């Protein structure tokens, strides 16, 4: 989980008056998936709950919530240069993340609407919410004389492929962790109004309910997983070439059989929980630490609260969750943060590329070791963890 920069292949600016943020492995990603598998999903196991959630989406509770008021007038000018830079960076990352969700949900709703209309409608409603969030954030950026070119982002961002099952895990956690992040900030600023640096935060209470409903949708979708796929593709891709044969259907069925074994689900649950928690912790205690300080928040306390709550929430749908109360859990995450700081110092320090690489290797290996030990940490069985959920 280092913060080493991945060189961008396109140097064109993505907003007016501001160079694009450097892309790192901690940056928001744009995703694509197997649309054929998605359109063939069998929802019958949990269709009633999915229909109820879709009805909630139709009501669009926040239709009139994201309306700017007079508090925004002149608010940008009140920020000192350092806080301004931190806040604009927050806006850019948040807007990119919300827009990434919009693109994925919109494309899913369009590609599966003929064969899976209920699923398509749910994705369309979520795309509406994500677009609204991204637009509201982008409007706040315009208060600082900046604006993300979302059309440019759509055309020029690299897209990462995730199979549907991985999309479910990752997006469920993203939405639920988003809920806890937003509500924690809102409640903190409600008690400490002097730390509210911008009126955008007044909208976080209702905003986080969109995130929560999206997470509930993926919860319901994952509960329909025992018989997810009706008919599987007769295609297989090898080395960039696609081949078609009826026998390939059995290959896919065997692959999905393996993926649906109880042990497999437990391993994937641990993987995605750790990936999301470690990424957030490394980012927030590293490059985002000063931003949370500007809100009067201690980044470590804030992240540990969010991780603990998200872990509890995940126990409702994942078979196992992380043992976040084990004393080594946060100790190892802190070690990763410490390693990342050293890696950053090496990157910005003196020395040639070869010597820097040799100095970085031990820290990369240490990060890998910490993550492996965290993954191998005995998980908690969700059925035993459920009573702690409120």
UniProtKB/Swiss-Prot annotation:
Bilayer-spanning residue ranges = none
Q: In which pathway does it act?
A: Porphyrin-containing compound metabolism; chlorophyll biosynthesis (light-independent)
Q: Name one GO biological process term.
A: light-independent chlorophyll biosynthetic process
Q: Which cofactor does it need?
A: Fe cation
For this protein, what reaction is catalysed?
Answer: Mg-protoporphyrin IX 13-monomethyl ester + 3 NADPH + 3 O2 + 2 H(+) = 3,8-divinyl protochlorophyllide a + 3 NADP(+) + 5 H2O
GO molecular function terms here?
A: iron ion binding; magnesium-protoporphyrin IX monomethyl ester (oxidative) cyclase activity
Task: Please tell me which top-level EC class this enzyme sits in.
Answer: oxidoreductase
**NCBIfam families, per the entry:** AcsF, PRK13654.1
Q: What is this protein called?
A: Magnesium-protoporphyrin IX monomethyl ester [oxidative] cyclase
Q: Which gene encodes it?
A: acsF
